[in-house]
Structure formats: structure tokens, C-alpha cells
From Swiss-Prot:
Biological source species: Novosphingobium aromaticivorans (strain ATCC 700278 / DSM 12444 / CCUG 56034 / CIP 105152 / NBRC 16084 / F199)
Keyword Ribonucleoprotein set for record: yes
Pfam families per the UniProt record, alphabetical: Ribosomal_L19
Signal peptide range in chain numbering: none
PROSITE patterns in alphabetical order: RIBOSOMAL_L19
Protein name: Large ribosomal subunit protein bL19
Domain of life where this protein originates: Bacteria
NCBIfam families: rplS_bact (TIGR01024)
PANTHER family registered for this protein in UniProt: LARGE RIBOSOMAL SUBUNIT PROTEIN BL19M, RIBOSOMAL PROTEIN L19
Keyword Transcription: no
């Protein structure tokens, strides 16, 4: 392991000690608590939508969340280890057979629905 990989691994371990990141993947509906600065105040804004992509690249990992806001599709890319992310919660798990769900961009209504994955406890 070279020096950069070692520093990234330490930074990720330090971040995971402070915050818990749930196990989620594309197709899952997630609620992301984002810290928003308004003047001198900071507040947490919830952004809920379907995770359509996840990129695992060490400290540069990110995920894309898509939601429909007032009839318009809105996508937002979140860095996974960003200090501006307050919390990530999985609302429901979805059944998909792709790692990237970019095809949802062209779909609306019932065709854009994702079936729920039943979680069985072993």
C-alpha cells in the first residue's frame, strides 16, 4: 500500500468512527440529511430519493440520488465522506438488476417504479 492509499484509509477510518454509513446500493430509496448554511445559521435539509448510481473510489466515493420535485426530475451527487452530509438513512430497499439506473431518467409515472426487496433475516 503506497502512502496516498494509506492516508485515504486512515481518513476513511476516522470518518467511519464519527458517523455510521448504512449499506445501500442502486435502487434503494435513501434520505440524506444535508447541512445547509444560511447566513450565520446552519440547518439540516432532508433530500429523499432513489439512489441511481454509486461510485466506490476510496475517499472520492459518491452516490447519485434522483427525486421528482414539482413534476421535474432532480438529481444530486453526494460525496460519501463529505462533512456536509449529516446522516444517510435507507427508507426502502429496491430490487434492480443494474448497478447504474440511468434509464430512470427517461421514465415517468408507473414505469419508473422500483419493486421493494424483501429483507429476510437468517
Amino acid at each position: 500500500m503506497n502512502l496516498i492509499q494509506q492516508l485515504e484509509a486512515e481518513a476513511i477510518a476516522e470518518f467511519k468512527a464519527k458517523k455510521e454509513i448504512p449499506d445501500f446500493r442502486a435502487g434503494d430509496t435513501v434520505r440524506v440529511g444535508v447541512r445547509v448554511v444560511e447566513g450565520e445559521r446552519t440547518r439540516v435539509q432532508a433530500y429523499e430519493g432513489v439512489c441511481i448510481a454509486r461510485s466506490n473510489r476510496g475517499l472520492g466515493s459518491n452516490f447519485t440520488v434522483r427525486k421528482i420535485s414539482f413534476g421535474e426530475g432532480v438529481e444530486r451527487v453526494f460525496p460519501l465522506y463529505s462533512p456536509n452530509i449529516d446522516s444517510i438513512t435507507v427508507v426502502r430497499r429496491g430490487v434492480v438488476r443494474r448497478a447504474k439506473l440511468y434509464y430512470l431518467r427517461g421514465r415517468t409515472g408507473k414505469s419508473a417504479r422500483i419493486a421493494e426487496r424483501k429483507v429476510t433475516k437468517a
